[in-house]
Amino acid sequence: MTQFDKQYNSIIKDIINNGISDEEFDVRTKWDSDGTPAHTLSVMSKQMRFDNSEVPILTTKKVAWKTAIKELLWIWQLKSNDVTELNKMGVHIWDQWKQEDGTIGHAYGFQLGKKNRSLNGEKVDQVDYLLHQLKNNPSSRRHITMLWNPDDLDAMALTPCVYETQWYVKQGKLHLEVRARSNDMALGNPFNVFQYNVLQRMIAQVTGYELGEYIFNIGDCHVYTRHIDNLKIQMEREQFEAPELWINPEVKDFYNFTVDDFKLINYKHGDKLLFEVAV
């Protein structure tokens, strides 16, 4: 049993047993297959904590880990909102939200690419500012990135689910706290928890720190009603030991990472489970 499997199953059980239904509301989300309202059971404010002795990835089902890393690189490294760039990587998870111009509007990578921080007399974006400050001002309590920009929310195809990171350097270790306003536990959470841990490992490597604690906070923690049956099946499955994530130690520049610089070794998992997408 992995740290992630244990915490994940605990949250799923809590939502199924104690979650509050939103069926009283005319909800925004619709099922992609038939356009009917996609309702949820939800609880508020859940936290997952990992000591980084193992990589947090589910073993009760197969997680498309390379796809998760490609999405991470698209947002954090390319700082892109262009869905066609993601399509070129063979990833189509954002196709349902693609606008006429081929982008997701002013969301995700667009926000990270804005040059809105002052550094040594010039403007830089949030990622470059974070990397510089972690190296040169590690004791700061202001190592934060933010994707929730009220000025741009109306210009986003989808407002960010994971919207904030806060980084701490203590005793030579890089700790990361992530905040998600909303998390679809069947589809979004396994991706997000894994990929932001990968981000922590990447940034620790290029800034010269050891790995510290990893904390993932969720505001609206929910399960879609059509996902419940398969989630119950998933929770009863055999759990395996956590795999090892290898990251190419030769990469010292954040912008030089490619998906080929990552290997998930001995990843044992249950069969893939299909969960319908709500948009």
From Swiss-Prot:
InterPro entries: Thymidate_synth/dCMP_Mease (IPR045097), Thymidate_synth/dCMP_Mease_dom (IPR023451), Thymidate_synth/dCMP_Mease_sf (IPR036926), Thymidylate_synthase (IPR000398), Thymidylate_synthase_AS (IPR020940). One of its GO terms (biological process) is methylation. DUMP binds at R141, R142, R181, S182, N183, D184, N192, H222, V223, Y224. It catalyses: dUMP + (6R)-5,10-methylene-5,6,7,8-tetrahydrofolate = 7,8-dihydrofolate + dTMP. It comes from the Viruses. GO terms for molecular function: thymidylate synthase activity. Its EC number is 2.1.1.45. Belongs to the thymidylate synthase family. This is Thymidylate synthase. It comes from Bacillus phage phi3T.
